[in-house]
Each structure stands twice: as structure tokens, then as C-alpha cells.
Amino acid sequence: MNTINKYSKTITQDETQPAAQAMLYGIGLTEADMYKAQVGIVSTGYEGNTCNMHLNDLAKDVKFGVASENLVGLIFNTIGVSDGISNGTDGMRFSLVSRDIIADSIETVVSAQWYDAVLAVVGCDKNMPGSVMAMGRLNRPAIMIYGGSIHSGKWKGESLNIVSAFEALGKKFNNTITPEDFKGVIKNACPGAGACGGMYTANTMASAIEALGMSLPYSSSNPALSQEKKQECLDAGKAIRVLLEKDIKPKDIMTKKAFENAMTMVVVLGGSTNAVLHLIAMAHSVDIELTLQDFQKTSNNIPVLADLKPSGKYLMEDLHAVGGVPAVMKYLLENKLLHGDCLTVTGKTVAENLANIPSLHQGQTVFLPLKTPLKATGHLQILYGNLAPEGSVAKISGNEGDFFEGKAKVYNDEYTVIDGVKNGEVASGDVVVIRYCGPKGGPGMPEMLKPTSAIMGAGLGKNVALITDGRFSGGTHGFVVGHITPEAYDGGTIALVKDGDTITINTKNNTIQLKVSEEELTKRKSEWKQPKLKATKGVLYKYAQCVSSASKGCVTDN
């Protein structure tokens, strides 16, 4: 039989470790506990945002379930950054950085404490990939437990979510919302605990990780405050014991085929562009090369079927009500769009997990059949051209068309764009260029939700495109292209764009072009000087020194 405490016994059963054992007795462990496997339960819980405010309570449920399986569960915490709070401020530069800090800190604690397994209770956007990256590096039995989605808010009969609050600002600029309604939307958009409710980054990553096999069935769609979520947490102990006994580790689960399942889920649900960065980084943690071309191949073959916000009508709670992510996976498997033989954290394969799962409800309109897709091919399009010779990522829902040509309106940060929208600088037909916001130039590759929301709220969404070497929130919609590489800080072509230049974006042939002669670009490049890093010490400075490009997942351990 497999020894399930093969790591912790180094501390608990070695007579040359008396001080370590004294400390463990000091926290309340018994003689019998010294022979049990130890499970590190990491929570990204903190009081500062709705996505994470309930996670420490869920971690206690997880600990109870672990103890019920004759295992020792020990809770520890790591950081979280709220994208919703930091968006549009300098704080957003710490968001992507937090993903790698989360991964590093979980790896550090589990390795130093000699835990035999890991259960991660996570909420906001970067929590999920950060925890799974750590699991991949550690390669010990592990399960991710998603904190679940928030319920929708309500104001004057209208359903609200976090993007309603962001877009209210653009409506205010455009004088299409009253002061009372502006305040009403803000006060009611987030009615309690849970991650942002649309198919934004948190729900995208939770769904992708469930399809990957690293979370239990329904984890991604069980609402935050539901009895189902509590039961999932209680059941995690039984599941982690199975993984310990069978010695099933992340590298057994996170295979190339499993990542193909995850990419399929991202596309079919119309998920966030951030999934490109995060899945590449997660694959890197288990020594699998995932590329931009893998995402394009998926988009070429998989349609968008879920009518979910930000581009569609519904929220994750609506998808859960008609069957949830497992029912979606069952539909995809029945139509030969998923690999059913991939192993998962249940100890069973995808196909085995789905065998007795109820199908999507008859007559529901949240997830459409293959014969009537929202978009016949994927919304994530990888674009190349003289503006992005190493690639970029466009999010094209189908509402924007597939071609845009316009005059560049250049900004060297995201803040001045807001003033540009407010003051009428940004006009119909413009291509807004936001640069020096890449992994190094930011530093931290901030999201552009505030500028895109201002553009949408001002009624310019169908007539203005936006391109950047930064990122987009999962809540962004419109004609947008991000992750442009090389970034401006590294002297990429985006650094050479001038106001009035013509930019062409063609998602049919996957190109993004600056219509400027090679001679002129060579002249501009010779005159360009690399700016000083915006950070001169601390975590952002360290990040800028070691981060890879967006096309490589912005990893910091390569």
C-alpha cells in the first residue's frame, strides 16, 4: 500500500526532529496524529473584497472534512489582490504579480512544512492560476476549491454585476444616467460574498481548471453562499484521501490533453483573454509547452455556445441553474469535443465523472446547441503583424465585426484615456493605443477594464477599437486587442505608433498592422529610447527583472 505520509513523516517520525515534534504537540496534535498524513489547506481569504471575504470560513469546512478522513488538516493563508478594487489605479500593477507571489508562497510553505497534500480555497482572478501553478511545481496530491460566484445585484428591477458599476462611469460622462441611478448601481451591484458573476476571469479560470481536472465536479459553478459549495468543501477531505492513497499527483492530471480540455472550455464559454496567460503559465509549472498557436487551433475548431456576460445575457448562477459546468462538459464529451480519458482529482477520468451527471435542462437558453452557436469559431483570436510580430490576443465575441481600420489615438498609460473619453478626445473611428503597460513596462501588465468600460459606457463601443501591451479584464467587451508582444518597453512596434497613424485589425486573417513604411519605422526605432523602469525597488522592480513576455505566460521562473 502507498505510504500517504511520505513527506510529513520526515518531521513527525524522525527522532532527530524533536523540536519540530514539540511544536506539533504544542498546536494540539496527539501521538496518533503523528502517524497521519498532513494536508496543507491554503486560503486566500481576507476581508477586503467580496470574492475572498468568505474563504476562511470555507477553509474551516475543508478542515473538518479532512479530519473526518483521519488526516491532519493545517490551515495557512496567502495573499490576494482584488482586481475590482485596484482596476484603474496603480494598484492594478500588483494584480498579475500576485499570481506568482501566491504560487511562490504556497510552494514555500508546503515544501518547508513537509505537507503531504494541498487543498487550496481560492476566489479572485489570480488566486486560481497561482494556486494551480504551485500544485504543479510541488507535484503532490492537490485539489483546488473555488470559492464560487456572487449572486446578481438588483436596482429598479434591473439585474446588476460588477461591470454594471464600471460602465456606469461612461454613462455618467455621456449624461445617460441620473445621479440617483449612478449611486444606486454602485451600492447594489455586489450584494455579498462571491467572485464576479459573469464569465469574467475568475469564473473563466474556475471553469477551465474544472475541465483540466484539478477541481471537483461543480466546483466552478456552485454559488459562493450555497449549500452545494459548503458540501463540496466538506467532501474535499474524502477526495484528497483518494489521491493520497492512489498517489495521483498534478503531473498525472495536468497533461497536454487535459490542457486541450481546459482551452476548449474557455472558448465554448466565451471566457477571458487572461486564460491565455494563465494556462500557459500553469502548463509551464508541469513542464508542458502550451503556445499561442494552441489557443488559435482551439478557436478554429470550437464555437462559442454560452450566452454569458460580458458579451451575452447571463451570469454563472444562471448556468448553474440549468446544469452547471459538468452538464456543459457532458454535452461537449457527447459531441466528441472533450478528451474523456483524462484523469481528474476524483481519481476517475472525465468520462467516468460525467457518466451519471444530469444533462443540460431541456429548453434552456444559457448554453446553445452546436447547430445554433453564438459564434461559429472561437472568440479568442491570435493576431500577428508588424504591430505584434510575437503575437497578440483579441477577444472578438461576434458583436464587433471582424475588421476595423482607424486612426491611432496614443496614450502612454491607461489613466489619461479616461480623461480622453470624458473630454471628447476619443471619437468614432479611433484606435486607442495604450502602451508601456506590459509585464516590464507597467510593471505588472495592468488590466484596461476602466478605459474599455468608459468607452462602452460612453456609447463608443461599436465604433472605437483599443489595443494595448497590457491586459484586459474578463469583464471587457468591444473590439479589443491585448498582450501585444514585444511590449513597448522592449522597443516593440507599439512604442513607435504616433497619433494619426492608420491601424488595421483583421480577425479573419489574424493580422494587426500599422500602415507605416518600413523606412519610417526604421527611422522611428533609431530615435526611440527605452524609458527608465517605473519601479526602482520592491516587488514590482523584482518582477520586471525576471518576468517573461505575455506570449510566454508572464512566468517568473523561466
From Swiss-Prot:
EC numbers, comma separated: 4.2.1.9
Pfam families listed in its UniProt record: ILV_EDD_C, ILVD_EDD_N
Binding site for Mg(2+): D83, D125, K126, E447
Catalytic reactions of this protein: (2R)-2,3-dihydroxy-3-methylbutanoate = 3-methyl-2-oxobutanoate + H2O; (2R,3R)-2,3-dihydroxy-3-methylpentanoate = (S)-3-methyl-2-oxopentanoate + H2O
Cofactor binding: number and manner: Binds 1 [2Fe-2S] cluster per subunit. This cluster acts as a Lewis acid cofactor.
Origin: domain of life: Bacteria
Binding, [2Fe-2S] cluster: C51, C124, C196
InterPro entries: DHAD_IlvD/Edd (IPR050165), Dihydro-acid_dehy_C (IPR042096), DihydroxyA_deHydtase (IPR004404), DiOHA_6PGluconate_deHydtase_CS (IPR020558), ILV_EDD_C (IPR056740), ILV_EDD_N (IPR000581), IlvD/EDD_N (IPR037237)
Entry annotated with the keyword rRNA-binding: no
An example molecular function term from Gene Ontology annotations: magnesium ion binding
Annotated Gene3D superfamilies: IlvD/EDD C-terminal domain-like (3.50.30.80)
Active site: S473 (proton acceptor)
Record pathway: Amino-acid biosynthesis; L-isoleucine biosynthesis; L-isoleucine from 2-oxobutanoate: step 3/4; Amino-acid biosynthesis; L-valine biosynthesis; L-valine from pyruvate: step 3/4
Keywords attached to this entry: 2Fe-2S, Amino-acid biosynthesis, Branched-chain amino acid biosynthesis, Iron, Iron-sulfur, Lyase, Magnesium, Metal-binding
Cofactor(s) needed for function: [2Fe-2S] cluster; Mg(2+)
Its biological purpose: Functions in the biosynthesis of branched-chain amino acids. Catalyzes the dehydration of (2R,3R)-2,3-dihydroxy-3-methylpentanoate (2,3-dihydroxy-3-methylvalerate) into 2-oxo-3-methylpentanoate (2-oxo-3-methylvalerate) and of (2R)-2,3-dihydroxy-3-methylbutanoate (2,3-dihydroxyisovalerate) into 2-oxo-3-methylbutanoate (2-oxoisovalerate), the penultimate precursor to L-isoleucine and L-valine, respectively.
Record protein name field: Dihydroxy-acid dehydratase
Biological classification of the source: Bacteria, Pseudomonadati, Bacteroidota, Flavobacteriia, Flavobacteriales
Gene: ilvD
